[in-house]
Amino acid sequence: MNNSHPTTKSHLFHIVDPSPWPILTSFALLILVAGGVSFMHSYKFNHYILAFGVISVAYCLYSWWRDVIKEGIIDHSHTEPVRHGLRIGMALFILTEIMFFGVFFASFFKSSLSPVGLLDGVWVIKQGVWPPPNIKVFDPFDIPFINTLILLLSGTTVTWAHYALEERNQKDCVTALGLTIILGIFFTCMQAYEYYHAAFKFTDGIYPSNFYLATGFHGAHVIIGTIFLIVCCFRARRGDFAIKNNGHLGFEFAAWYWHFVDVVWLFLFTFVYIFGS
């Protein structure tokens, strides 16, 4: 009897083994959020709660994605209906991310198009003045423009990696992914440098709050996307993507996510940096 894994399943339905990771990831996220709130309010043991939350989320996500990769590469469970369902799931996930950023942009436009004076003395905003007169904003054609060029170039390199993957060119795929990762890390370093030299703090008013929430949330997505691409680069070197019809979803989703990050930054650069200045 041949006990090797078949190349396809005997059916096309999306039936996978029961997994503990969705519910465990939910609890880990709850701990992470609780740790973040505790850290902001300087509660007792806040550092330990936050660290435990970060480690728990990282471990759960690693284990969950490891099992998904095993289902596709070893168990050959990713039939066409399964891949179609996973693509829909990723598209819906990106849609929820768009909603997140939509809220930030709505807050920014509400504050910038109709700035009003607050009487409690917390924020200094004068009627019809944006940015607030006490805020020294960034020059949009300094570091923000460099970051725009970096992300546009990274979008080109990840597309190059995609074409190399389609042509079964492992060397070019790994090279292009490596360049994209370097550009992503460079973007994060430039963003950190910009934050370090900012002339305002998060608590200095409505403008800094909107600025740091929008750009910081995007920066977190760049870091997540970079990690996503690093995993894909290791998998490409290992030859996972050479398995026809089963090993491409991870890279495909990473490319979608990275292009989404690129597009969001173009909106941030246009409205928050140029219009907002």
From Swiss-Prot:
<dbReference type="InterPro" id="IPR024791">
    <property type="entry name" value="Cyt_c/ubiquinol_Oxase_su3"/>
</dbReference>
<feature type="transmembrane region" description="Helical">
    <location>
        <begin position="45"/>
        <end position="65"/>
    </location>
</feature>
<keyword id="KW-0812">Transmembrane</keyword>
<keyword id="KW-1133">Transmembrane helix</keyword>
<feature type="transmembrane region" description="Helical">
    <location>
        <begin position="173"/>
        <end position="193"/>
    </location>
</feature>
<feature type="transmembrane region" description="Helical">
    <location>
        <begin position="211"/>
        <end position="231"/>
    </location>
</feature>
<feature type="transmembrane region" description="Helical">
    <location>
        <begin position="88"/>
        <end position="108"/>
    </location>
</feature>
<keyword id="KW-1003">Cell membrane</keyword>
<dbReference type="GO" id="GO:0005886">
    <property type="term" value="C:plasma membrane"/>
</dbReference>
<dbReference type="InterPro" id="IPR033945">
    <property type="entry name" value="Cyt_c_oxase_su3_dom"/>
</dbReference>
<dbReference type="Pfam" id="PF00510">
    <property type="entry name" value="COX3"/>
</dbReference>
<comment type="similarity">
    <text>Belongs to the cytochrome c oxidase subunit 3 family.</text>
</comment>
<dbReference type="GO" id="GO:0019646">
    <property type="term" value="P:aerobic electron transport chain"/>
</dbReference>
<dbReference type="InterPro" id="IPR013833">
    <property type="entry name" value="Cyt_c_oxidase_su3_a-hlx"/>
</dbReference>
<dbReference type="InterPro" id="IPR000298">
    <property type="entry name" value="Cyt_c_oxidase-like_su3"/>
</dbReference>
<dbReference type="InterPro" id="IPR035973">
    <property type="entry name" value="Cyt_c_oxidase_su3-like_sf"/>
</dbReference>
<keyword id="KW-0472">Membrane</keyword>
<protein>
    <recommendedName>
        <fullName>Probable cytochrome c oxidase subunit 3</fullName>
        <ecNumber>7.1.1.9</ecNumber>
    </recommendedName>
</protein>
<keyword id="KW-1278">Translocase</keyword>
<dbReference type="GO" id="GO:0004129">
    <property type="term" value="F:cytochrome-c oxidase activity"/>
</dbReference>
<feature type="transmembrane region" description="Helical">
    <location>
        <begin position="255"/>
        <end position="275"/>
    </location>
</feature>
<feature type="transmembrane region" description="Helical">
    <location>
        <begin position="20"/>
        <end position="40"/>
    </location>
</feature>
